[in-house]
Amino acid sequence: PSRKGFGYGVNGGMTRYAKVAARLLHKIPDNISFDYAAMTEPCAVAYSATIAPGFVRPGDRIVVYGPGPIGVLCAAMAKLAGAEVALVGLEKDKTRLEIAKSYGCEVIIGDASTWAKSVDGLGADGVVDAAGVSASLKNALSVIRPNGWISKVGWGPQPLDFSLDPLVAKNVTLRGSFSHNWPMWERVLRLLESGKLDLKPVLGGVFPIKDWQVAFEKMQSGEILKSVIRPE
């Protein structure tokens, strides 16, 4: 709970200069632009929630709740690991769900039970909750198979209004995922360098710093997933 990071507990990177310990720096490969390098952080969050635990196996069926930037990137990471992935959202999320299709994901509006249980009737092998609302965790417990896993990366202030008994009855592993570490950034940079992880669908625009408010509003409205702000 006391862990700090740039932009969380200490000042972030939206400044002309930043003082950083040399041991925290990463060398950007020559074939990665600064625009894409700036996207390493959310990619590392998704890597931490999806790949780092070692749960995902080729051929697994994974459900991801929440088609925001982290949810889409979690889905992309699970696809890279060889899983079949469905990203779940609401009617208002159609634009973001379309972006997920470019990563080869199934997209679902509403109930994911049919897709999750379509193979053997038992449910999904794993669920990533990137929505951070009480309902998404409740749905995750509904679609997960016995001995499956749930990775909760989404934050939310709402108290749980349902029983956790299904977690016990199904012997489900529930894992919280917060932030990332230095080696994860290095792995993400290698994925970008090799071209295995394509960020074109996620990066919706590059804006001069004077248009920072436009960049944030476009993300907030769901028009784009992520934006990059360049200093002038």
Residue locations for each model-derived region?
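Short strand-turn motif at the edge of the Rossmann-like AdoMet-binding core
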Residues: 153-157, 177-179, 203, 207
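Glycine-rich cofactor phosphate-binding loops and adjacent beta1-alpha1 units
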Residues: 54-58, 86, 98, 102-173
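Mid-domain Rossmann-like dinucleotide-binding core that forms the NAD(H)/NADP(H) cofactor-binding site
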Residues: 32-115
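C-terminal hydrophobic helical "lid"/dimerization subdomain
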Residues: 138-142, 182-232
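Glycine-rich phosphate/adenylate-binding loop and adjacent beta-alpha elements
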Residues: 1-25
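Residues in the short beta-alpha loop(s) of Rossmann-like NAD(P)-binding domains
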Residues: 89-93, 156, 180
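Glycine/charged-rich beta-loop-alpha catalytic/anionic-binding loops adjacent to active sites
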Residues: 24-35, 122, 170-171
